[in-house]
């Protein structure tokens, strides 16, 4: 991933020896000041990655097995699961290689490790970009289904959805390759941050607009049935809570990583920023957690998908 040179983890592990580190402790930065560092045990990181891997594989298999789920909406959900699967898998692979190098179980030249590091970084970066894009695509799809309900099936066709999916994957791989090749340039890191903020604003605007429409719809129904205002307020509160959870999880899981990239550009040598840089693995762990949560929000809430998943699991036994 595009981080500071000292944090290129695979290359650093060639000449490193494993050291015991606490999960939470005070570490000294370059100026000798004390700062909070959260160390994520490799076992915990790999376990979270495995949970995410299994979850998202199940989503992909369930959607692929059920032809009723071969719709544009589930196409985006399936691709989101595939992106999250690659995010988890690439980070697990990197961690496993690091552990093997540190244990001496894997012997490799620096040039080979450099190439492997670049490949893993491209996979990780492209899957992160595609994951953000598919979250935005799902928001746009839901927006069209609400505000253009009568024209939805003519606007969002499976053919167009597949074109969007192909464009997202191609663009993600292309731009991630450029990002990794020029990760030392401030403009590259800032463009990633701007892209994240654009996705955040897009999702917030669309979902807030959808919430407002839902409240208006509930108010109209309440007036038709001559109900009191609390019924309308209940819908608004429930929708606001759902929106807060959805956007809150997105910002909490992705925000720290992009804050990290921003600080690399703004204050690479500042003591406070150096303390934040020490928690890079924590920020990656939060992204893995997002990959675990995404299926719960976007996939497993579907009864049709849950039924298909149950059949798949029963057949596997």
UniProtKB/Swiss-Prot annotation:
This is Melanocyte-stimulating hormone receptor. Glycans are attached at residue 29. SUPFAM superfamilies: Family A G protein-coupled receptor-like (SSF81321). One of its GO terms (cellular component) is plasma membrane. SMART domains: 7TM_GPCR_Srsx (SM01381). One of its GO terms (biological process) is adenylate cyclase-activating G protein-coupled receptor signaling pathway. It is found in: Cell membrane. GO terms for molecular function: melanocyte-stimulating hormone receptor activity. PROSITE patterns: G_PROTEIN_RECEP_F1_1 (PS00237), G_PROTEIN_RECEP_F1_2 (PS50262). Receptor for MSH (alpha, beta and gamma) and ACTH. The activity of this receptor is mediated by G proteins which activate adenylate cyclase. Mediates melanogenesis, the production of eumelanin (black/brown) and phaeomelanin (red/yellow), via regulation of cAMP signaling in melanocytes. The gene is MC1R. Residues 1-37, 94-118, 184-191, 267-279 are extracellular. Keywords: Cell membrane, G-protein coupled receptor, Glycoprotein, Lipoprotein, Membrane, Palmitate, Receptor, Transducer, Transmembrane, Transmembrane helix. The chain crosses the membrane at residues 38-63, 73-93, 119-140, 164-183, 192-211, 241-266, 280-300. It is a multi-pass membrane protein. A lipid is attached at residue 315 (S-palmitoyl cysteine). Belongs to the G-protein coupled receptor 1 family.
């Amino acid at each position: 991933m595009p981080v500071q040179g000292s944090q290129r983890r695979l290359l650093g592990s060639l000449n490193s020896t494993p050291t015991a580190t606490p999960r939470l402790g005070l570490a000294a930065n370059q100026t000798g000041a004390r700062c909070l560092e959260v160390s994520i045990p490799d076992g915990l990181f790999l376990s979270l990655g495995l949970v995410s891997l299994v979850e998202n594989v199940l989503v992909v298999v369930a959607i692929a097995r059920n032809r009723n789920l071969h719709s544009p909406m589930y196409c985006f959900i399936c691709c989101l699961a595939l992106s999250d699967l690659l995010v988890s898998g690439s980070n697990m692979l990197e961690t496993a290689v690091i552990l093997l190098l540190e244990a001496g179980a894997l012997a490799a030249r620096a040039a080979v490790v450099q190439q492997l590091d670049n490949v893993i970084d491209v996979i990780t970066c492209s899957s992160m970009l595609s994951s953000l894009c598919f979250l935005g695509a799902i928001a746009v799809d839901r927006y069209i289904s609400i505000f253009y309900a009568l024209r939805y099936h003519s606007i969002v066709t499976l053919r167009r959805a597949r074109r969007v999916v192909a464009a997202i994957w191609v663009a993600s791989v292309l731009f991630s390759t450029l990002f990794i090749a020029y990760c030392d340039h401030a403009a590259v890191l800032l463009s990633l941050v701007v892209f994240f903020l654009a996705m955040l604003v897009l999702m917030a605007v669309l979902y807030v607009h959808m919430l407002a429409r839902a409240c208006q719809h509930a108010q109209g129904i309440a007036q038709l049935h001559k109900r009191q205002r609390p019924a309308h307020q209940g819908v608004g509160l429930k929708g606001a809570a759902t929106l807060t959870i959805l956007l809150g999880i997105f910002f909490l899981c992705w925000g720290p990583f992009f804050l990290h990239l921003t600080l690399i550009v703004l204050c690479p040598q500042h003591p406070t920023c150096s303390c934040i840089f020490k928690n890079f693995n924590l920020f990656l762990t939060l992204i893995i957690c997002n990959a675990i949560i995404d299926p719960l929000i976007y996939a497993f809430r579907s009864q049709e998908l849950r039924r298909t998943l149950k059949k798949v699991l029963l057949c596997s036994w």
